[in-house]
A protein has these predicted regions:
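Conserved CoA-thioester-binding segment of acyl-CoA-metabolizing enzymes
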Residues: 1-51, 87
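Terminal peptide-recognition signature
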Residues: 13, 17, 32, 48, ...
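Residues at secondary-structure transition points
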Residues: 19, 23, 30, 59, ...
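A general structural signal for well-ordered alpha-helical segments in protein cores
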Residues: 29, 48, 61, 82, ...
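Crotonase-fold acyl-CoA enzyme core
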Residues: 88-177
């Protein structure tokens, strides 16, 4: 689910659901939130990366389907937990570096927007893909708006994919390697 490794003062967190492109479900959301809430005094930075061929595909569609049968109160509680995960990235007391490769869609872009530094491979592909599912990226919006401002409007509405170079142009990506 989540690989945690401490090395030379850096906490490495690996999203480890490669069979679903590291898509979020309740367990991964809880694991990432807990890990970021347990920063040790010796930790000087956090690196979040995806295992396998993708950084993060956003929400797991099977998990999202299950949510469609929940009550409004249950859905609100799940949305709050998701927000708290992004907020844990954003408010982490040490710098958070997102190390992006491959696809980074929806909520994956939320992690990127909440991170302090984003290092992306030149082959990474980003998209705020919620619109393709008939959804709005409400939970990640506060973090994305802080990071890229007015660029978010077009990207949210069109769900158009963009490469790491464009991500750097608009301020989502810090450096492309």
């Amino acid at each position: 689910m989540l690989i945690e490794e401490r090395k030379n003062g850096v906490l490495y967190l690996g999203l480890n659901r490669p069979e679903v492109r590291n898509a979020f479900n309740a367990s991964l959301i809880q694991a990432l939130t807990t890990a970021l809430s347990g920063i040790a005094e010796s930790d000087r930075a956090v690196v979040i990366r995806g295992e396998g061929e993708a950084f993060c595909a956003g929400g797991d569609l099977n998990w999202m389907r299950e949510q469609s049968t929940q009550s409004e109160a249950e859905n609100a509680a799940d949305a709050l937990k998701l927000y708290e995960m992004f907020d844990a990235v954003y408010r982490c007391p040490v710098p958070v570096i997102a190390q992006v490769h491959g696809p980074c869609f929806g909520g994956g872009c939320g992690i990127v927007a909440a991170a302090d530094i984003v290092v992306s491979s030149s082959s990474a592909l980003f998209a705020f893909s919620e619109a393709k599912l008939g959804l709005i990226p409400a939970t990640i919006s506060p973090f994305v708006l802080r990071k890229i401002g007015s660029y978010s409007r077009e990207l949210f509405v069109t769900a158009q994919p963009f490469d790491a170079g464009r991500g750097k142009e608009i301020g989502l990506v810090s450096s492309v390697v």
